[in-house]
Amino acid sequence: MTKNPRNNKPKKILDSSYKSKTIWQNYIDALFETFPQLEISEVWAKWDGGNVTKDGGDAKLTANIRTGEHFLKAREAHIVDPNSDIYNTILYPKTGADLPCFGMDLMKFSDKKVIIVFDFQHPREKYLFSVDGLPEDDGKYRFFEMGNHFSKNIFVRYCKPDEVDQYLDTFKLYLTKYKEMIDNNKPVGEDTTVYSDFDTYMTELDPVRGYMKNKFGEGRSEAFVNDFLFSYK
């Protein structure tokens, strides 16, 4: 009996339990409805906290590499524990068109600490990228240095878990603008050195090491940062 080839397509969710467990599902759906070509090509890791620490024992991580037309890769990670729900993705476009990445950090650390960040992250150092018609940041979030791989349009909001979808329409607008960049330029280059400075900077900036070490141990934490999150440095 011939199998239906449609059944062999990679899922657009991380695993069978993912859809019912994340508060970020509407954002994830919007992302892959905008870029349906980004299919899972590698399941990089599926971890649980095991016995690393008492605090980390209930933590679970899934990390995927996605590939698709006009993109070198999109790498996504989803981390959950009884309090946290964190979804992180960066889309790396193919090179030759001087385009930014698109990055999103959707972070629920507790019911009192939820942070939404998405932005056009340009690989060029000391270059202030901006898009007309989108909100502009006022610079109050000093952690994100506009003009150094973060754009003038970086979107940062703190909210409560039941408020996250209030910013979904803005997120979709950013996605629409980014899709226009990709569709208009259709990048095809594969020079990963273009992203060397970007990944080096993000490695130094990213605060995930301490969190990951606590949840999954030092070895896994270092591998996650260096071999998965920022592998082009």
From Swiss-Prot:
Catalytic activity: (3Z)-phycoerythrobilin + 2 oxidized 2[4Fe-4S]-[ferredoxin] = biliverdin IXalpha + 2 reduced 2[4Fe-4S]-[ferredoxin] + 4 H(+)
Key words, A-Z: Oxidoreductase
Entry superkingdom: Viruses
Gene3D superfamilies given in the database record: 3.40.1500.20
Record keyword Oxidoreductase present: yes
EC class name: oxidoreductase
This enzyme's EC code(s): 1.3.7.6
GO biological process, one term: phytochromobilin biosynthetic process
One Gene Ontology term of the molecular function aspect: cobalt ion binding
Family from the record: Belongs to the HY2 family.
Free-text function comment from the UniProt entry: Plays a role in phycoerythrobilin biosynthesis, the red pigment chromophore photosynthetically active biliproteins of the host cyanobacteria. Uses a four-electron reduction to carry out the reactions catalyzed by two enzymes (EC 1.3.7.2 and EC 1.3.7.3) in host.
UniProt-recorded name of the protein: Phycoerythrobilin synthase
